[in-house]
Amino acid sequence: MGDVIMKQPDGGYHVTDGSNMLGGDYHKTIRASDGTIPEEDIKRYYDIAMKLDWQDGWYSSEEMKAQAKTSGYKHIHLGGHDTKREEYEIQQDWVKEIWEKVNPGMKLLRHYLNGHGKHQSGGIHLDGWTANQYTCIVYLTPGWEPEDGGSIEFWTPNLTDEQRAMAIKTPYGLNGDESKNIVKSYWPRAGRVVLFDGRIPHVARAVETDKFRVSLVFKGTTDEIKKEEEEPVKNTSKDPFKGTSIEGKD
């Protein structure tokens, strides 16, 4: 399905990807579960994550990075791509263990770690602009309590005209409800798994104590995607330099 042009209430027009109109009302496609991962494993995964090399100054979007209204949080890229839709294999054994427990039946596009310290938060954003894209978050900080803050909020998809144009099959489309409200919110209990449609506006609110909130994030799709391409292996059987340091080189 290609682009769809829709007339807005003010008489203007907006172009949206036609795939956004597939399926039904996505704004409540949010699920959470506890007890999927044993407590002793959570502690082990957290210890592994804390020994990794974290990158500072990360933001929820390039626009938020440019504005820098809040301090950036920490981040580790673990695999996959932001711009390419290719299925790939997870390289970290401990992450594979988690994915095997929480995979809702989607093909993985990207996975990474986010880390938020005291007073660090994200910004309201979307993870995807087309149908059939989902995000799965696993919270890994042991001993997290409600008073530690850091809850994730999910908002009505009407915060911008672009979101409203995309939300044509929800109650919040261009001619729908303009009230901006939180749909659901979850605190980051250790081991909690949260799954949601990538088109839902969401934000990780600030941590209130000295604890460090570690979130393992998986982004995937239920669409068919191609496998990650491997570098072709050259046939060097007739290479005159076979057995030397320049075998197979152009």
Identify the residue ranges that each predicted region occupies:
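Non-heme Fe(II)/2-oxoglutarate
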Residues: 2-105, 232-235, 241
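Intrinsic disorder/low-complexity signature
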Residues: 7, 14-17, 72, 111, ...
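Tryptophan-centered motif/residue detector
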Residues: 54-58, 143-144, 219, 250
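Catalytic core of non-heme Fe(II) oxygenases with the double-stranded beta-helix
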Residues: 96, 100-233
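Long, low-complexity, intrinsically disordered segments
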Residues: 238-250
